[in-house]
Amino acid sequence: MLSPKRTKYRKYHRGRMRGAKTRGNEICFGNFGLQALEPTWITSRQIEAARRTITRYTKRGAKLWIRIFPDKTVTARAAESRMGSGKGAVDYWVAVVKPGTIIFEIGSVPEEIAKTALNLAAYKLPIKTKFIIKDNIS
């Protein structure tokens, strides 16, 4: 699973996801991409499940770029613990995804294979997504 090697702080506030993404919303590396249409947190397990789906479907013939990284911690309290006594322990890592964010990019495969692979990966994610194509494919 993806997680940072070290962070400035162990625990973070939840924050709010307002507005659309202004950076990271265009295809930079591959020819095809999967773009988020809703704001959400995507866990490192969900990213890994989608990555495995893409690599299995393309039979490792595609070049894959993961454009999001889970750099925020989510904490959880132990079951049946009393209120108070501080914030819970770190449970898992999430990537904050806003509408317009490119989640995955894929290259070196035909459009039909890329579209099917990214649609299969989209089933593993908790949001609505759309398949996009780079403008200047030569």
Swiss-Prot record:
Q: What is its main location?
A: plastid
Which CDD domains does the UniProt entry name for this protein? Ribosomal_L16_L10e
Q: Which keywords describe this protein according to UniProt?
A: Chloroplast, Plastid, Ribonucleoprotein, Ribosomal protein
> Is Chloroplast found in the keyword set?
yes
Q: Name one GO molecular function term.
A: rRNA binding
Q: Where in the cell is it found?
A: Plastid, Chloroplast
Give the matching SUPFAM superfamilies: Ribosomal protein L16p/L10e
Q: Name one Pfam family in it.
A: Ribosomal_L16
User: Which parts of the chain span the membrane according to its record?
Assistant: none
* Protein name (record): Large ribosomal subunit protein uL16c
Ranked from the top, the taxonomy reads: Eukaryota, Sar, Stramenopiles, Ochrophyta, Bacillariophyta
